[in-house]
């Protein structure tokens, strides 16, 4: 009862039920000499005290042993967990935020130690990851990074299929078919396999695992000639929608986001189908969009699925590479990403029914109850009408700036300068405003003041 507050969401109340056991359990925190290190956990933040101050350019190595029980995402919500399929008694795991992650220390605010309250997402430093994932031997695994031991976990014919997919530009190549997935669902292996992944210069790591997965892939050629693998994994429940559109939407997103910003710097981009979620991580995202059980689907479901894939894959650029502070400023990734999502959707299909971007889409919000409207430059946890304010309004503002004030050519040049200047760095709102003005030689103070600092 002491954990119940006067104002709580339904998701927060669900987490108080017996099915949620409270998250991470820490077994120990030790130095490399195996001696315990002092630490304190304050809700979602943890402080570890090293034996001596870390000097500039110095290093501090330590070891943490922890564990937690994977939650039923469909019951208590959240960005990570499992979905259970009663019809065939199988699980689909989408796993994220599963390890203690470093906080950011930067030259503007020092340590970013704001608590995670749900809306304001994550602020993370870049790092290199080597991750071993041991799962039942009949599971397929998708993850941040490049698979290091394909010879150990994939048959030769599947590795050959992946090479064929790398050379394909028009249609995805099926690596594991629906027929294979259906057969795989019927039995459960009592053996395990360890999938090994490595990722460089990423701010996070996530993965998905299931014996239900269908897998398809194709190559996307960059301007420098390098090839990125656009890939999807999804259960049979996602078909026929997912086999028709998912990987094509991934490839389309990489093409057009790279056109407006920079070549995608990572080797793979995954789209994973999971019910009732749209969530992004480096090189991998979890996306909704499920047909009816008979395989039929509406235009709304179709475009919703394509749109969420474009949006979540697009997050690889903002904030996974242009690494803004999501905890503080949701609009810096969601708003910019929603703007590019709109441009990319219009390249997918003329008159694509975009939810955000066109000016008329924001009219009802802007003329609404002024007591329920906050400036875009409002902390992520204090925003009324979160979607309109952090996604729709900045997307509309940038669209107006591009179409009616700066013009497409000048805007696109300045926006690309911002993206390239701040990739693999931690920009603040002022860095975005200054760079757009600096690159275009246009004084936009009046525009930022009106659109971002007032209602």
Can you name each region flagged by the protein language model?
Residues 8-86, 90, 181-190, 194-195:
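A surface-exposed beta-strand-loop module
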Residues 1, 46, 53-143:
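Surface-exposed, acidic/Ser/Thr-rich flexible loop segments
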Residues 85, 176-185, 189, 430-439:
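Short, charged low-complexity linear motifs
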Residues 42-44, 53, 65-71, 136, ...:
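An acidic- and aromatic-residue-enriched active-site/binding cleft used to recognize and process polar
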Residues 1, 197, 230-455:
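Hydrophobic alpha-helical and helix-loop surface patches within well-folded domains
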Residues 2-8:
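A solvent-exposed, charged loop/short amphipathic helix patch at secondary-structure junctions
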Residues 100-111, 117-310, 339:
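Hydrophobic helix-coil surface modules that form long, contiguous segments used
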């Amino acid at each position: 009862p002491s954990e119940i507050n006067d104002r709580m969401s339904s998701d927060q109340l669900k987490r108080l039920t017996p099915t949620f056991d409270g998250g991470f359990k820490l077994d120990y925190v030790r130095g490399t000499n195996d001696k315990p290190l002092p630490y304190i956990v304050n809700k979602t933040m943890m402080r570890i005290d090293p034996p001596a101050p870390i000097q500039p350019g110095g290093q501090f190595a330590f070891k943490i042993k922890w564990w937690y029980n994977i939650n039923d995402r469909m019951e208590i919500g959240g960005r990570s967990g499992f979905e259970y399929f009663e019809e065939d008694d199988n699980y689909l795991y989408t796993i994220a935020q599963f390890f203690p992650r470093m906080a950011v220390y930067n030259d503007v605010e020092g340590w970013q130690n704001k608590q995670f309250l749900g809306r304001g997402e994550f602020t993370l430093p870049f790092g290199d990851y080597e991750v071993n994932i041991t799962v039942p031997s009949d599971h397929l695994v998708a993850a941040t990074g490049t698979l290091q031991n394909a010879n150990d976990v994939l048959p030769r014919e599947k590795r050959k299929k992946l090479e064929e997919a790398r050379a394909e530009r028009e249609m995805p190549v099926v690596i594991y078919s629906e027929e294979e997935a259906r057969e795989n669902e019927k039995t459960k292996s009592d053996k395990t396999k360890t999938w090994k992944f490595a990722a460089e210069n990423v701010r996070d790591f996530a993965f998905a695992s299931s014996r239900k997965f269908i897998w398809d892939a194709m190559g996307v050629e960059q301007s420098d000639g390098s090839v990125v693998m656009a890939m999807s994994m999804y259960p049979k429940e996602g078909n026929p929608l997912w086999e028709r559109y998912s990987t094509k939407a991934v490839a389309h997103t990489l093409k057009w986001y790279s056109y407006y910003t920079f070549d995608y710097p990572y080797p793979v981009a995954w789209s994973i189908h999971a019910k009732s979620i749209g969530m992004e991580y480096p090189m991998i995202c979890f996306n909704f969009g499920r047909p009816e059980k008979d395989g039929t689907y509406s235009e709304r479901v179709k475009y919703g699925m394509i749109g969420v894939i474009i949006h979540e894959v697009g997050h690889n650029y903002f904030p996974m590479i242009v690494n803004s502070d999501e905890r503080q400023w949701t609009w810096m990734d969601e708003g910019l990403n929603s703007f590019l999502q709109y441009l990319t959707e219009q390249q997918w299909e003329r008159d694509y029914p975009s939810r955000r971007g066109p000016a008329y889409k924001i009219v009802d919000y802007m003329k609404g109850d002024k007591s329920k409207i906050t400036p875009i430059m409002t902390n992520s946890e204090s925003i009324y009408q979160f979607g309109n304010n952090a996604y729709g309004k900045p997307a509309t503002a940038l669209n107006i700036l591009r179409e009616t004030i700066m013009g497409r050519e000048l805007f696109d040049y300045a926006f690309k300068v911002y993206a390239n200047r701040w990739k693999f760095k931690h920009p603040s709102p002022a860095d975005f405003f200054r760079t757009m003005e600096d690159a275009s030689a246009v004084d936009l103070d009046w525009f930022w003041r009106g659109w971002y600092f007032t209602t």
